From Swiss-Prot:
Protein's name in the database: ATP-dependent RNA helicase DHH1
Purpose: ATP-dependent RNA helicase involved in mRNA turnover, and more specifically in mRNA decapping. Is involved in G1/S DNA-damage checkpoint recovery, probably through the regulation of the translational status of a subset of mRNAs. May also have a role in translation and mRNA nuclear export.
Biased composition (Basic and acidic residues): 1-10
Lineage: Eukaryota, Fungi, Dikarya, Ascomycota, Pezizomycotina
Low complexity biased stretches: 439-473
Domain Helicase C-terminal: 260-420
EC number: 3.6.4.13
GO BP annotations, alphabetical order: mRNA processing; mRNA transport; regulation of translation
Segments forming domain Helicase ATP-binding: 80-250
Gene Ontology MF terms in the entry: ATP binding; ATP hydrolysis activity; RNA binding; RNA helicase activity
Annotated segments matching region Disordered: 1-44, 431-522
Family of this protein: Belongs to the DEAD box helicase family. DDX6/DHH1 subfamily.
Gene this chain is encoded by: DHH1
Location(s), subcellular: Cytoplasm, P-body
Catalytic activity: ATP + H2O = ADP + phosphate + H(+)
Length: 522
């Protein structure tokens, strides 16, 4: 079906009736800097379609091009024309190949802003992914007059109830919170024709499936259901058979791992892992890195160790308060800090273009988790590294993951070729469009030179006293306006489950840092 539509669409062009006028509007677009990084066939192996071939609204095309999109990726070519027809879709594609835009673009095209009803529900498994997806909707649809609302657990219902008193066309959120709003008759889904699940394999796991089934009861029977994911377990087929009508199946997983990611392992004893990580920091040319641990406790302990070594570091996990998680996510995406230590909270769908190195400080237990972790680098066909610190107990997991994914994880060489992961022009890496008002952006954002954007990391002790470089030093001392307890606050203290630790090279003068309370829920 998609091939037939593609053939028809290749000959389709928008026109307002006058020669040459169809391209005149492009000259007035506020286009971002061109991203000239090398891309792999994961996103370049297309049928040659253009976004104009889909007969989209001009205002939507303007948002697409101003967001930096040039041509549709393979998953977008396959899904957009089918989604526009209203047919149910089961789409499977690799991490970081443009799945979000593959369902957001047809959604924005089909929504009528004159109808003050919820017309699309987008479900995601985590709060961070909900924020990211809602921002994509707002960015691509900024010329359409469409209202987008994001709602997740961990916050009060009052603000959501007030927000829903005004027209909302798209709701992006986590299942539990949406069910609360629908069950209280605050969110009216009775005329919502589109039901979308991103990271569908996670949403159809045991913990979410009952909620998903209940949510579907609030939708009309003739709704369009679209599922997108990188992996489709049997639970997805069961859901499809029960709740979808002749879904169009898209499978672009000729292989599971992204071609741009080079994978290595280093065999180290547990007690030598921090030393090994320090060596990697000193030798790799890191733009931004994400370091994964297998527990929230180890996340905090490792973040403390990295700070003590003198490197800038954020941490995030599910037991942190929501406002702290939001701030960490926002600031890391905008390049305020170079390294992020986290649990598997951020393995799902998170798109940070500047991340070129992922380190599994703790090796994952299964292939699915490994696949999603390493997919945080090498986004959208670009290059990246995945480095795994392996101890004796991990050796069988390493073998099993290689077998299950059909990939090879090589021993780390003494020297890693920079061409495998280093960007020649890091200043051209796209940064997300912030939704903070002007003047409220982090102080360091937008002030990095290309040399600061990408360099070998050096401990803070080597920096001139009082003048830490961007991405270096204890970030709280560089950004004193952030009084958040999860940003190491100068000095040392205890509170709940967390700690605050004094960084080196900063300007903090004592005080106490506090971690998340013991009773905070994920």
């Amino acid at each position: 079906m998609a091939d037939q539509l593609a053939d028809k669409l290749k000959s389709t062009q928008l026109s307002d009736g006058s020669p040459g006028a169809s391209d005149e509007w492009k000259k007035n677009l506020n286009l971002p800097a061109k991203d000239n990084r090398q891309q792999t066939e994961d996103v370049t192996n297309t049928k040659g379609l253009e976004f104009e071939n889909f007969a989209l609204k001009r205002d939507l095309l303007m948002g697409i091009f101003e967001a930096g999109f040039e041509k549709p990726s393979p998953i977008q070519e396959e899904s957009i024309p089918v989604a526009l027809t209203g047919r149910d879709i089961l789409a499977r594609a690799k991490n970081g190949t443009g799945k979000t835009a593959a369902f957001v673009i047809p959604t924005l095209e089909r929504i009528n802003p004159k109808i003050s009803k919820i017309q699309c529900l987008i479900l995601v498994p985590t709060r961070e992914l909900a924020m990211q997806t809602s921002q994509v909707c707002k960015t691509l649809g900024k010329h359409l007059g469409i209202n987008v609302m994001v709602t997740t657990g961990g916050t009060g219902l009052r603000d959501d109830i007030i927000r829903l008193q005004d027209p909302v066309h798209i709701v992006v959120g986590t299942p539990g919170r949406i069910l609360d709003l629908a069950g209280k008759n605050v969110a009216d889904l009775s005329e919502c024709p589109m039901f979308i699940m991103d990271e569908a394999d996670k949403l159809l796991s045991i913990e979410f499936t009952p909620v998903i089934e209940q949510l579907l009861q609030f939708h009309p029977k003739d709704r369009q259901v679209m599922l997108f994911s990188a992996t489709f377990p049997l639970s997805v087929k069961d859901f499809s058979d029960k709740n979808m009508v002749s879904p169009y199946e898209i499978n672009l997983m000729d292989e599971l791992t992204l071609r741009g990611i080079t994978q290595y392992y280093a065999f180290v004893e547990e007690k030598q892992k921090v030393h090994c990580l320090n060596t990697l920091f000193s030798k790799l040319q890191i733009n931004q890195s994400i370091i994964f641990c297998n527990s929230t406790n180890r996340v905090e302990l490792l973040a403390k160790k990295i700070t003590e070594l003198g490197y800038s570091c954020f941490y995030s996990h599910a037991k942190m308060q929501q406002h702290a998680r939001n701030r960490v996510f926002h600031d890391f995406r905008n390049g305020v800090c170079r390294n992020l230590v986290c649990s598997d909270l951020l393995t799902r769908g998170i798109d940070i273009q500047a991340v070129n190195v992922v380190i599994n400080f703790d090796f994952p237990k299964n292939a699915e988790t490994y696949l999603h972790r390493i997919g945080r680098s090498g986004r959208y066909g670009h290059l990246g590294l995945a480095i795994n610190l392996i101890n004796w107990d991990d050796r069988f997991n390493l073998y099993n993951i290689e077998r299950d994914l059909g990939t090879e994880i090589q021993p780390i060489p003494a020297s890693i070729d920079k061409s495998l992961y280093v960007y020649e022009n890091p200043e051209s890496i796209p940064r997300p469009i912030s939704n903070l008002p002007r003047g409220q952006l982090p102080a360091a954002q937008g002030q990095q030179s290309p040399q600061q954007q990408q360099q070998y990391q050096q401990p803070q002790q080597t920096q001139q006293a009082g003048l830490p470089q961007q991405g270096q030093g204890n970030w709280q001392s560089q950004n004193p306006q952030h009084g958040n307890p999860h940003y190491n606050n100068g000095g040392r203290g205890r509170g709940g489950r967390g700690r605050g630790y004094r960084g080196r090279g900063g300007q903090g003068q004592g005080g106490r840092g506090r971690g998340p309370p013991r009773d905070v829920q994920p």
